[in-house]
């Protein structure tokens, strides 16, 4: 039986619940807006709830004040969420409960292998510590893979096939430095919040291959997935904080929203100057067509650092 702290009490109805879950490693940029807007429109078009979660579980990567700035940016662009913001930094007890349960069930083990060793064997962990019975000192925790996912269905892209070696890897769920791994925290929180569909960027397809097995280990219903196209800079790299993509403009949000809608293949108001942010979004929800969203990544120089 799962610990009650992180067990989600199943909802009595089948309401759609989506979410946007940024990490506070910097301000939102155009690529972030694509993910936020796509998930928002999908939720609102389904008469569902749209939640926001701040994934602040990796302090070394976080920028002071970025979380608050992200929330202000969402509001400035008219993307208003339902309920309270969930902060992963306040969910450590739930992650500990999840780790303890997996350990008690024999579904995880301690690993002392270094990155250098794993790189030396090709970059995919080989299960070296599975039967060595290490203790917790100076060790990471790995899942004992029971349900390798070699393919899954994406509602935009169809069946996505995964690298079999990657799918079978015993991946880390608690880091050697004591931080909770992204994949564990995301699954525990998405289940806790009752998320029924995850709409996010295509750069997160690989983590999906790791997250679905965690749902299955916990005995939870797996949500649906949609992976949106990525915005690229002229050099072909994903717009990201690491690549110094500029923050979303602080002025009139409407032209940026129109550009984001067009990026997603959606009908956009031709005379947007005559409409408010709220009216633009209302129209976008009414006319939202997932089938019109392109699958491929798209170069967008307008909001990349090439235009700065």
Swiss-Prot record:
Binding site for ATP: 241
Alphabetical UniProt keywords: Aminoacyl-tRNA synthetase, ATP-binding, Ligase, Metal-binding, Nucleotide-binding, Zinc
The protein's Enzyme Commission number: 6.1.1.-
Family the UniProt entry places it in: Belongs to the class-I aminoacyl-tRNA synthetase family. GluQ subfamily.
Family matches, as Pfam families: tRNA-synt_1c
GO biological processes: glutamyl-tRNA aminoacylation; tRNA modification
Intervals of motif 'KMSKS' region: 238-242
Positions annotated to bind L-glutamate: 19-23, 55, 182, 200
Species for this entry: Shigella flexneri
Gene Ontology CC: one annotated term: cytosol
Motif ('HIGH' region): 22-32
Coiled coil: none
Signal peptide: none
Gene: gluQ
Cofactor note: Binds 1 zinc ion per subunit.
Function summary: Catalyzes the tRNA-independent activation of glutamate in presence of ATP and the subsequent transfer of glutamate onto a tRNA(Asp). Glutamate is transferred on the 2-amino-5-(4,5-dihydroxy-2-cyclopenten-1-yl) moiety of the queuosine in the wobble position of the QUC anticodon.
Annotated residues for binding of Zn(2+): 111, 113, 125, 129
Protein name as catalogued: Glutamyl-Q tRNA(Asp) synthetase
Cofactor: Zn(2+)
EC class (word): ligase
